[in-house]
Amino acid sequence: MENTKTNASSSGMSSSSSFSVSYAEEMLLADEVSKINSMSILGPNQLKLCTQLVLSNGAAPVVLSLVSKEKKSILSRILPKIGQRLYVHHSAIYLLYMPNILKSSSGSITLKLFDEATEELVDVDTDHDATQACIFAGRYPRSILAKDAAKGHDLKLVVHAVASTKANSAVGVLYPIWEDELSRKQILERGADFLKFPIAETEPVRDLLNAGKLTDFVLDRTRLGVGSKNDPSPVLLEPRAKITGKAKTVFIPEGPSVPNTTISGMAPTVRIDAGSPKGLGVPKGFTYESFIKDEILPDH
């Protein structure tokens, strides 16, 4: 069964165009779409992580097509067979953002969806804190014509980053994850804002407080001391000459009968003790030889 439709202007047949539709073609379209959806690489509800986008400070906006190369290749093969009555749906779009800059810096990220065929924009987030990791989740509420997607006029993700850090330095990394499903039916959904799920910072991945490793590190690079653990308390220091021993002084009373005696060539020194209670005399029987031997040279 085949029908023909003709469009004419008000002036008659001055301008016309016609095309034919076929029930067989519609069935072929349904069969082809079913085959596409049954393929593991292009199955429905299959999310795709195709790339990562490094966002540079102040650089030109990054633009990414949200129709994968695999889908475009399939479209280029099947569109001549089934005509142009096929659509691409983006029923799930996730954008994982991981910052490269510290919390002490500042910056913002702008994310938008752009339908190149209709030149329409949908805001994902126009002022996201560039220091905060998060996941954006949402969808595009309209279908993209397969013929437009095959030509590259598809849904685009546009991202721009500005921060207080060095120009053209990496502000963060964006991981787009999406679903691009082929269907012969259009979608008509209410537009909804993208959801944003912040990601908390994690604990350190390594424990620094390992006493054994720190001790080994110090021992390898430090000269160890062997002195006392505690220094002495400050005290008054009095410099004095050190006396090794006390000299012995011999008091020898001198009388008129005391001879000058020399023993072994050594003459003893005689000190006159005028204050002796016994006067200037000497005891009876006193001799220098016995005094020297007994008092001065007891070891000889």
From Swiss-Prot:
One of its GO terms (cellular component) is host cell plasmodesma. Belongs to the alfamovirus movement protein family. GO terms for biological process: transport of virus in host, cell to cell. Pfam families: Bromo_MP. It is found in: Host cell junction, Host plasmodesma. Disulfide bonds: none annotated. Transports viral genome to neighboring plant cells directly through plasmosdesmata, without any budding. The movement protein allows efficient cell to cell propagation, by bypassing the host cell wall barrier. Acts by forming a tubular structure at the host plasmodesmata, enlarging it enough to allow free passage of virion capsids. InterPro entries: Bromo_MP. The keyword Transport applies. This is Movement protein. It comes from the Viruses. Its main location: host cell. Keywords: Host cell junction, Transport, Viral movement protein. The keyword RNA-binding does not apply.
